[in-house]
Amino acid sequence: LLERMALLDIDCIGLDWTIDMADGRRRINSVQEKAVQGNVDPVVLFASEDAVEDAVRTVCKKAGPKGHVLNLGHGVLVGAPEEKVKHFFDVSKTIKYD
């Protein structure tokens, strides 16, 4: 399905948390280069701050330095602690690429 989506006249494809970011990007870009959005598992917001940081850094590393919109793979789930949502954004602001 990702390969077919890559043929559409769109700039960015959102990936949910069930798709490995590196694999999704590889499959999409094997057809046509597109930006990708996602795909941190939204359940991580119920885990520790260390788990949130690890998830954000892992997704960013797999996505690479160009053409990635960091986001949750679904959205903020009801009941997610606001301090974890804030931490998600705080960590995202520290991401640097060499």
At which residue positions do the language-model features occur?
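Active-site loop segments of alpha/beta catalytic cores
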Residues: 1-98
